Amino acid sequence: MKKNFLFVMAAAAMLASCSKDAAVSEPAGTGNENGVVDPTDPNSPVLVRLGAGGLGVDVTPTRGVVDSWNNTVVGIYALAKDADFTEWQAGDGSILLENEKGTITGNPDGSVIKDAITIAEKYYPGNNDIHYTFYGYYPYAGADADDTTPPTNENGKVTKTFTINGSQDIMWGQAVATKINNKDGGEQLDGYNALYFRKGQDAATPDIAFEHKLTQLNFKIKKAGEFSTAGPDKQLSVTKIEINTFPSLDLTIADKAGTDNGNIVPTDAIGGAADIPVIKNDAGDDADAVIVDNIDGESAFGTSMMVYTAGETQTTYSAKVYLKMGTDGEEVSSPITIKLAEDAAFEAGKSYNVNIAVNSMMKVEVNATLTKWQPGDDAEDIEIN
């Protein structure tokens, strides 16, 4: 089952006398659940409302991994789907929300309350001839974010380039309006606008289902069955693990043609893959060494690493495990190949435990087990000599 993260967005509108440019602020009344300020007024403005569906998994606020909403900051777009617009430009009504910052509050226990997303108060334009689709992405990038470079909007595509160190949990989602009947008759309503919520039969607040775009790897170290200590001054340590993956990725947030929505690919201009060290925090500091002799059971190495997957063709990851005996010993790298049973592919939105069993300086056993985000089968054991 794919785990999605939902937040609810009510369409927005302005009074009919207002212009058809991007949404603006306007005082609101009590309104109904879809944001219509005065349901008895056929020309009532419709407020943009943001909320979130319920999730039951806790998340540590300091980590990049998102399992539930907890003051999570996302970027939101509302863009015209109409064929009249070949691209989205300021001033022509095709952009309702552009990289709008939204905060999904959540609850202390990790569950989510409705209307938990906070943005500046916005309304739809008063005319009803433009139909919008909503898009969201995480982590948010803008002038007031850690990443100050916002997404680009060029040639009918909104894209964001992420430079990653393994801590970034990149997510994306969209909400496309379902065709519904007009209470007054005539053509069905197709696309979020003021009329959709004023006159739509059974109009529902838009849901954006965020999905993880990367694969999560969790490294664990343990003693192999044949492990024996060489003495207190020759304790064996795993000092570093490197994954061969892509350090820069391009996420398509919105594509006017509709073919690339949500796609994530390596950045062409950066080049190929690189060896990225397993880290211990969002700052990108290398994970602390683990002394194998002292392990009782297993020991986590670093923190969760989010890495790119090519989908069906990503059946392996190459990595290096660095070993050192004693404080003055030579550091030796041991290449490993991480793979799943039956050559299954590593999937976005899934979490895998990579269990490394150390026998000696030149013998490492590896297996990977799928956990957390989505459950799945265990991976086959691999022994590297």
Segments predicted by a language model, with ranges:
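Compositionally biased, low-complexity linear motifs
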Residues: 173, 305-309, 361-369
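Extracellular/surface-associated beta-sandwich interaction domains
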Residues: 2, 26, 34, 207, ...
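Sec-dependent signal peptide hydrophobic core
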Residues: 5-10
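Short, low-hydrophobicity acidic/polar segments
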Residues: 22-237, 279, 283, 289-301, ...
